[in-house]
Swiss-Prot record:
GO terms for biological process: translation. GO terms for molecular function: structural constituent of ribosome. This is Large ribosomal subunit protein bL35. Residues 1-25 are annotated as: Disordered. It comes from the Bacteria. Belongs to the bacterial ribosomal protein bL35 family. Disulfide bonds: none annotated. The gene is rpmI. Signal peptide: none annotated. Pfam families: Ribosomal_L35p (PF01632). GO terms for cellular component: cytosolic large ribosomal subunit. InterPro entries: Ribosomal_bL35, Ribosomal_bL35-like, Ribosomal_bL35_CS, Ribosomal_bL35_sf. Keywords: Ribonucleoprotein, Ribosomal protein.
C-alpha cells in the first residue's frame, strides 16, 4: 500500500501542540479592518484551537502530524 499524503493546504495552516491539540490562526484579520474595533483586531491576533468535532476530519487530512 502506498504512503498516505498529507493535505498540503492544511499542513501549512495547522501545528500540533505538545498535548496533541491542533493550533490554528484566526480568520478575518487580513483586510476590511477599518470597521473592526481595536479590541476585535487584538483578539484576532491570538491563535485558536481546532474544535473537538473537527479533530476527526483533521486527522484524515494530516495523518502524520
Amino acid at each position: 500500500m502506498p504512503k498516505m499524503k498529507s493535505h498540503r493546504g492544511a499542513a501549512k495552516r495547522f501545528k500540533k501542540t505538545g498535548t496533541g491539540k491542533l493550533k490554528r490562526a484566526k480568520a478575518f484579520k487580513s483586510h476590511i479592518l477599518t470597521k473592526k474595533s481595536p479590541k476585535t483586531k487584538r483578539n484576532l491576533r491570538k491563535g485558536g484551537y481546532v474544535s473537538k468535532s473537527e479533530e476527526k476530519v483533521m486527522k484524515k487530512l494530516l495523518p502524520y502530524l
